[in-house]
Amino acid sequence: MANSFATRTFTTLSDLQPNMANLKVIGVVIGKTDVKGFPDRKNIGSERYTFSFTIRDSPAHFVNAASWGNEDYIKSLSDSFRVGDCVIIENPLIQRKEIEREEKFSPATPSNCKLLLSENHSTVKVCSSYEVDTKLLSLIHLPVKESHDYYSLGDIVANGHSLNGRIINVLAAVKSVGEPKYFTTSDRRKGQRCEVRLYDETEFSFAMTCWDNESILLAQSWMPRETVIFVSDVRISFDKFRNCMTATVISKTIITTNPETPEANILLNFIRENKETNVLDDEIESYFKESINLSTIVDVYTVEQLKGKALKNEGKADPSYGILYAYISTLNIDDETTKVVRNRCSTCGYIVNEASNMCTICNKNSLDFKSVFLSFDMLIDLTDHTGTLHSCSLTGSVAEETLGCTVNEFLAMTDEQKTALKWQFLLERSKIYLKFVVSHRARSGLKISVLSCKLADPTEASRNLSGQTRV
């Protein structure tokens, strides 16, 4: 260890045996759970509190530790260190691990032992990084699983339902980190969630949800489009609401930030190269129609309220959803100078180069020709009695459903027919489902995508516009 610790004797984690006493161990914290309270069976009406963490002192050895006690002690101990800190634990109780029961909820470790910390006998000291050998601190960047033992995001999507409920490992780059959202459960317990968007060479966006405070704190330190993570033992499930596969951080999960492995370095080079060329621009993601159950979107906004929400949510990456009763005030589908149909790559959905008619993204590392298809791609303005939202994105199948025609049918129309189609919307109020996210690049401060646009029922529109009570 470092010179500061030269005179101290530490027991290595590989030498731990059940019932050993009067020892000290040192290690870097690689995982940690939230504090939880449970009814105390011995003292009816009171609660006992606990949390656990995982420490590592060498590439091959790491062990779980847990502490039980009263609320003040446990919360104070938990707040004293975080993932990435180096700690010295004195006088822990060494117990034999019940592998089948404990590894169902705790990280799998190579040790057959676990540490139990007692308020009366054990102490935990956080070491300064200046005191600790850099070899010990570097362990935080070493995954607890083999560096090649992971699924790509594309593999997860391709396997689909067959991976539902499975616990696997994932290597991915961080695309965005959402703002933590706080809530209260039906039994009045406080909760929180944070959605992280991941991507890699095979998939441009994949959701991972953090429900515990420790993983949320860790996620807040990640730099979008710069950080790579190796997520060990994350749960994969099918999200019925969004009709896609997602990942969830659980108590077994250990996340390694910026892992120092060959595979991670390859991914890091990929994101650095594509950061410059905007290969994974949000434009691609906005093209694909999100499989959102529209019946779950209930908040009704005016244009003014949407703009106000943009000011309140400045700096937040999470998208919001809502309903707008408005007129389409700009719909340039009969203007020859405005292009509303574009060629897109059938593989990645990106707009292809018009001159070559080839996808510069998919063909960058491949000589195989990628087919293209025609797709609506237009910007519209939406206006109600409070203002106008400019440059809202209306694309793909949503645009086809809105206009009531396919791209090929639209291209076969005369200019007069296109003008008549346009005025069907300019004269009538529509019920519009929107996805909106704060964006400094957008004219209104909001990047807005239309999820559905249909002529509104006059009675329904009047009722909602007069109330505006659902926001």
Curated annotation (Swiss-Prot):
> DNA-binding region located at which positions?
167-272
GO biological process: what's one of them? male meiotic nuclear division
- Give a GO molecular function annotation for the protein: single-stranded DNA 3'-5' DNA exonuclease activity
Asked if Repeat is a keyword of the record, the answer is no
Q: Which domain of life is it from?
A: Eukaryota
EC number of this enzyme: 3.1.-.-
Instruction: Give UniProt keywords alphabetically.
Output: Chromosome, Cytoplasm, DNA-binding, Exonuclease, Hydrolase, Meiosis, Nuclease, Nucleus
Q: Which GO terms describe its cellular component?
A: chromosome; cytoplasm; nucleus
**Location(s), subcellular:** Cytoplasm; Nucleus; Chromosome
SUPFAM superfamilies per UniProt: Nucleic acid-binding proteins
Does the record's keyword annotation contain Cytoplasm?
Answer: yes
Q: What class of enzyme is it?
A: hydrolase
Name the family. Belongs to the MEIOB family.
How it assembles, according to the record, is: Component of a multiprotein complex with RPA2 and SPATA22. Interacts with SPATA22. Interacts with the complex BRME1:HSF2BP:BRCA2.
Function summary: Single-stranded DNA-binding protein required for homologous recombination in meiosis I. Required for double strand breaks (DSBs) repair and crossover formation and promotion of faithful and complete synapsis. Not required for the initial loading of recombinases but required to maintain a proper number of RAD51 and DMC1 foci after the zygotene stage. May act by ensuring the stabilization of recombinases, which is required for successful homology search and meiotic recombination. Displays Single-stranded DNA 3'-5' exonuclease activity in vitro.
Question: Any idea what this protein is called?
Answer: Meiosis-specific with OB domain-containing protein
Which organism's genome codes for this protein? Macaca fascicularis
